[in-house]
């Protein structure tokens, strides 16, 4: 009986998290955050991260809204922001290895928005660009996927990087 109760409460938590994340937009973010914090986010931290990444990939134009949501949650539960960042980076690395331009570009955009919202440090952004453009130590030029991903990433957070770490941005190699 206790196992059935746990399973039922887990399903309720999953439905609650997914329902709230899927409703998030510019107009109702402030109204949905108290609902989200009313849920057991410690227990459902993995669910929340998975739901946010999935929703962001389905609607990339809402990336800044999801990043703002994560930034607000990160102020109360920093471990959750760290978990989401780790998951985004793992998925991004997998997408780059598979040369999946659509996924890597979408995740790079989300990473850029997380940097813009101060969930991730700008040095991570600079390291990411250098990783993309230096192509793992061999003498071959970076792949087209890496160049496209770096361009979309810089488009999204280049302004902040130039303001906060201009010397780091000038270290980015010029391709051509």
What are these regions (language model features)?
Residues 1-68, 72-86:
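Long, low-complexity, highly charged intrinsically disordered regions
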Residues 2, 51-58, 91-100, 132-142:
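Helix-loop junctions that connect tandem helical modules in alpha-solenoid scaffolds
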Residues 27-35, 61-74, 102-114, 127, ...:
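Amphipathic alpha-helical elements of HEAT/ARM-like alpha-solenoid repeat scaffolds that form extended
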Residues 37-42, 58-62, 73-83, 94-101, ...:
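Flexible helix-coil junctions and inter-repeat linker/turn elements that act as hinges
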Residues 49, 70, 82-93, 108-111, ...:
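Hydrophobic core segments within long, regular secondary-structure runs in both alpha-
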Residues 122-176:
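Extended alpha-helical scaffolding segments
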């Amino acid at each position: 009986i206790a196992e059935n109760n746990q399973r039922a409460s887990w399903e309720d938590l999953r439905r609650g998290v997914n329902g709230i994340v899927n409703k998030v937009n510019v107009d109702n973010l402030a109204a949905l955050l108290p609902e989200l914090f009313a849920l057991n986010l410690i227990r459902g931290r993995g669910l929340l991260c998975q739901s946010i990444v999935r929703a962001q990939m389905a609607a990339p134009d809402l990336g800044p809204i999801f990043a703002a949501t994560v930034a607000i949650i990160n102020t109360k539960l920093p471990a959750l922001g760290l978990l989401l960042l780790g998951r985004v980076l793992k998925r991004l690395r997998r997408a780059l290895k598979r040369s999946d331009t659509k996924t890597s570009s979408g995740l790079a955009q989300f990473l850029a928005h997380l940097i813009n919202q101060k969930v991730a440090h700008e040095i991570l952004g600079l390291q990411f660009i250098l990783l993309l453009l230096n192509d793992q130590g061999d003498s071959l030029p970076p792949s087209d996927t890496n160049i496209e991903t770096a361009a979309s990433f810089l488009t999204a957070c280049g302004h902040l990087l130039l303001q906060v770490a201009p010397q780091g941005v000038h270290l980015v190699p010029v391709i051509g």
